UniProtKB/Swiss-Prot annotation:
Pfam families assigned to the protein according to its UniProt record, in alphabetical order: Thaumatin (PF00314)
Expression by tissue: Equally expressed in the abscission zone and surrounding tissues of both fruitlets and leaves.
Lineage: Eukaryota, Viridiplantae, Streptophyta, Embryophyta, Tracheophyta
S-S pairs: C33-C245, C81-C91, C96-C103, C151-C234, C156-C217, C164-C180, C184-C193, C194-C204
Name of this chain's protein: Thaumatin-like protein 1
Function of the protein: May be involved in protecting plant tissues from pathogen infection.
Length: 246
């Protein structure tokens, strides 16, 4: 009798999971850069974080994490990371401030290239993009694996650090440009940040700095209202491949 009740409970649990739309979307990270990257993950809306919130990814290595559905969050790549004598872990770009390899619910300090994904329930329509709204630190792309609909890759393959204007440059200890600020971060003005009184698309056109980002990476979000050519969709429960230096 106990076995029958246990079996029934198991079937009931599976049915609840199935009909509630529970589904894990595999998200794979691949590093094609010539240097090590430390990916970070951040779940939105103060919901539970993924099982991996930060890890080391050497050149040529791939690693995966499962995201539930529905789910929404962002991914980033930290560079030039090290651990000091006290054991504190920090990165020169996109540091999440946790003091550890794991970000533990902390986001990337800008400037940072971001991949944003919103996973729908029940195989509905997912949304995803590469965003440079918080600036740029390394090339990234996101591509659905499987799924139905358009399901095109969104990519920013250019190294914007090489053409970053002087006012936006972030330099490393060796004097090289290691990241490129957004105009909003650099100047903190409403016309660049799309904040009042410039908080509508018609009052916040893309500045020249954003146009430079857009020229280098046409598929990426370059400023707050840049969504017509930069938001991508896919349905049918696809997996996702995020590539550093595609």
């Amino acid at each position: 009798m106990m076995k029958s009740q246990a079996a029934l409970l198991g079937l009931t649990t599976l049915a609840i999971l199935f009909f509630s739309g529970a589904h894990a979307a595999k998200i794979t990270f691949t590093n094609k850069c010539s240097y090590t990257v430390w990916p970070g993950t951040l779940t939105g809306d103060q919901k539970p974080q993924l099982s991996l919130t930060g890890f080391e990814l050497a050149t040529g290595i791939s690693r995966s994490v499962d995201a539930p559905s529905p789910w929404s969050g962002r991914f980033f790549g930290r560079t030039r990371c090290s651990t000091d004598a006290s054991g504190k872990f920090t990165c020169a770009t996109a540091d999440c401030g946790s003091g550890q390899v794991s970000c533990n619910g902390n986001g990337a300090a800008p400037p940072a290239t971001l991949v944003e994904i919103t996973i729908a329930s029940n195989g509905g329509q997912d949304f995803y993009d590469v965003s440079l709204v918080d600036g740029f630190n390394l090339p990234m792309s996101v591509a659905p694996q499987g799924g139905t609909g358009k399901c095109k890759a969104s990519t920013c393959p250019a190294d914007i650090n090489k053409v970053c204007p002087a006012p936006l440059q972030v330099k490393g200890s060796d004097g090289s440009v290691i990241a490129c600020k957004s105009a909003c971060l650099a100047f903190n003005q409403p016309k660049y940040c799309c904040t009042p009184p410039n908080d509508k698309p018609e009052t916040c056109p893309p500045p020249d700095y954003s146009k430079l980002f857009k020229t280098q990476c046409p598929q990426a979000y370059s400023y707050a209202y840049d969504d017509k050519s930069s938001t991508f969709t896919c349905s049918g429960r696809p997996a996702y491949l995020i590539t550093f230096c595609p």
